[in-house]
Amino acid sequence: MDKTIPIEFANSVDLAIIAFYFVSVIGIGLYFSKYIKGAGDYFRAGNKMHWWVAAISSWMSGFGAFVFTGLAGMIYLEGLQAALLTTTGLPAMIFAYFFFAKYWRRSRVMSILEYFGIRFNKVSLQISTWFYIPIYVLIMSAGLYSLSFFVGTALHFPVETVILVAGISIAIYTVIGGIWGVVITDTVQFLVLLPVSILMIPLSIHAVGGMDALVAQAPSGFWRPFSGEIPNAMVTIPFFLAYMLQIIHGQNTNPIAQRFFSVRNEREAQ
């Protein structure tokens, strides 16, 4: 039976809520700008950040519209083996707890690039800086595009328009509010996203006819990861291991490491 759910585009109330959200995040950046008295406040919050705020921000920094679009699509096509990609943050956090967190906090630098300059030399600092710039332009562009594609589809707006509005809003609260503007905005997003995501679980299961229907209608190999039953699967064991290494690296270097620099002591970094 075809259970396709028709798409209902946003109405005026939805648009008003979204507009309020954009105004709010810009307001957060403006509000926390008053706490910035120097570079230490701007880049590492003057080492006054509470661990739980830093933790939420770290998690949210790796969470975007891709989870609801690209990753959800991969799980739909490839089953549990694609869903296991979401577990790769666990080894990253284990490495952070036992090694990276306390040593990054102990370094007392404002960025990893600054650490390169202190630990090695200015040449290392310059090379690393110019190496990071194009990489993070691509990473941020991909994240902004996935966000804009998702929002543009829901609002029935051109993707280019959403990219422009979202990009400018993000730039404003980031540049004005510094690390405080970023982490508080991340925390607000978390408080909005968590209940909605939890609510989506029973609604999604109900939409497919219950758990029994979900299990019964899944294609062969959907619940058996890496069994070879999924044709042309992208998520293979080598892919999974490479992805896990990338997450371990990404969660313990720029820009996530800024949270380690910003908390009050090594214990809170852990």
Task: Give, region by region, the residue ranges found by the protein language model.
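Hydrophobic core positions of alpha-helical segments in small-molecule transporters
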Residues: 20, 88, 165-166, 184-188
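Membrane-water interface of alpha-helical transmembrane segments
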Residues: 4-15, 40, 44-47, 79, ...
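Membrane-interface "cap" regions at the ends of multi-pass membrane proteins
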Residues: 2-68, 174-177, 190, 196-203
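Helix-loop-helix module between adjacent transmembrane segments
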Residues: 60, 83-177, 241-249
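Membrane-helix boundary/linker segments in multi-pass transporters
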Residues: 28-49, 102-114, 123-124, 256-270
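Loop-to-helix junctions at membrane interfaces in multi-pass transport proteins
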Residues: 2-10, 47-49, 53, 70-84, ...
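Extracellular loop-to-transmembrane helix junctions
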Residues: 9-33, 45, 53, 73-109, ...
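Membrane-water interface regions at transmembrane-helix termini and the short interhelical loops
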Residues: 3-6, 74-76, 100-105, 146-153, ...
